[in-house]
Regions:
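SAM cofactor-binding core of SAM-dependent methyltransferases
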Residues: 30-69
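A short acidic, Gly/Pro-enriched loop at the edge of an enzyme's catalytic core
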Residues: 70-81, 88
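S-adenosyl-L-methionine
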Residues: 1-46
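Conserved beta-strand signature within the Rossmann-like core of class I S-adenosyl-L-methionine
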Residues: 118-125
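Short "lid" loop at the C-terminus of a central beta-strand within the Rossmann-like core
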Residues: 40, 86-87, 127-130
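Class I S-adenosyl-L-methionine
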Residues: 127-199
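A short glycine-rich, Lys/Arg-flanked "PGG" loop and its adjoining helix->strand segment in the class I
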Residues: 98-117
């Protein structure tokens, strides 16, 4: 899969989803059951299952974001908008008194668990890393279920002293199909020959 990278210019807005190129990108993927664990005052709240730990926002749930994600069944959502306020390290300052941010890996683990095969995670951040291809879970390096190559990256420039808005679209692969692909990559000709020899003896 080749990553589609698009760069556009737009005026900044404190509500990221209201920036036209961002809004257009989200609308392109927003089909089926989508959730937003950090919804704040999202313009898409009528089209998503929303959560914000701050009860001042009119969302479906007011839970810790990790607990919100944990309540969904495996492979049960078509997509997730993942837009933590500012950086993952600054969230405590923004949500003063509302508890501690969990390690990113704990979010990523839940996100990969609940997204359906071929579903999407649209991430917002300081870089375009998005969802990791693999990470350590319980001390062991494991595949996360997302393709290594990003589906799409949108860079929205705002000019002046404003930082760009970076959006990454990751797609979860169909695990059965991916297992076949991985098997083909891993098995060498020598291993294949040895297996054939064992089966024919």
């Amino acid at each position: 899969m080749e990553t589609k990278i698009v760069r556009k210019w737009a005026m900044p807005n404190k509500n990221t989803f209201s920036i036209k190129p961002v809004k257009d990108l989200i609308c392109k993927y927003l089909k089926g059951k989508w959730i937003d664990p950090f919804a704040n005052d999202s313009i898409f709240k009528d089209r998503l299952i929303t959560n914000d730990i701050n009860s001042a926002y009119n969302t479906n749930y007011n839970l810790d974001a990790l607990k919100f994600l944990q309540q969904f069944d495996d492979d049960s959502v078509d997509g997730i908008l993942f837009d933590p306020p500012y950086s993952i390290h600054q969230i405590n300052e923004v949500y003063d008194g509302f508890g501690k941010i969990k390690q990113f890996s704990r979010y990523a683990h839940e996100i990969k668990r609940i997204i359906k095969p071929n579903g999407y995670c649209i991430s917002f951040g300081w870089n375009t890393n998005g969802m990791p291809f693999e990470m350590k879970i319980n001390g062991k390096k494991q595949k996360t279920g997302f393709y290594k190559e990003k589906k799409e990256i949108l860079i929205v420039s705002h000019g002046g002293c404003h930082n760009d808005t970076l959006i990454t679209v990751d797609q979860k692969y169909n695990s059965q199909l991916k297992n076949v692909i991985l098997s083909e990559e891993i098995i060498t000709e020598e291993e294949l020959f040895n297996r054939y020899e064992e089966e024919t003896l």
